[in-house]
Amino acid sequence: MQSDIKNDLVYLLRILESIGKIQLYIADFEEAIDFFRANDQQNFNASLMLLINIGEQSNRVSNALKGKHSSLAWTQIKGFRNRIAHDYIGIDRFITFDILQNELPILKNQLEQIVQIELSDDNFEKEEYELAKSSEYYTHIDYKNID
């Protein structure tokens, strides 16, 4: 785990990118069973992999940033990642769908606020943030919510 907050921007952007993709994958679904069955379960499986990535990236965030923004559920994010990674087949599709629809937007908003705060406090490099905005790897982030 990194100890310098300046390194955390990339991890938070990776999480926001994963959230943006998941929101794209669930956008057309109101029922968990429809989401689970869609595209031969591709949307569901891709979302699980992105949730694993969210957990991986959150684990890389420095203790300094986690301490500064302790209201975010860092431990639960990592815990859900571990649950998916170690019991992939046993993951409840209804609970997962509920998390994707109801918890992920809250997490997204919290992370956008953290990025905004850390940029304005000069703890993140603005140049690095601007580069990310033009990168093809970060096209699913709602930058308007941060700028």
Question: What are the functions of these language-model segments?
Answer:
Residues 1-147:
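Solvent-exposed interaction patches of small proteins and small membrane subunits
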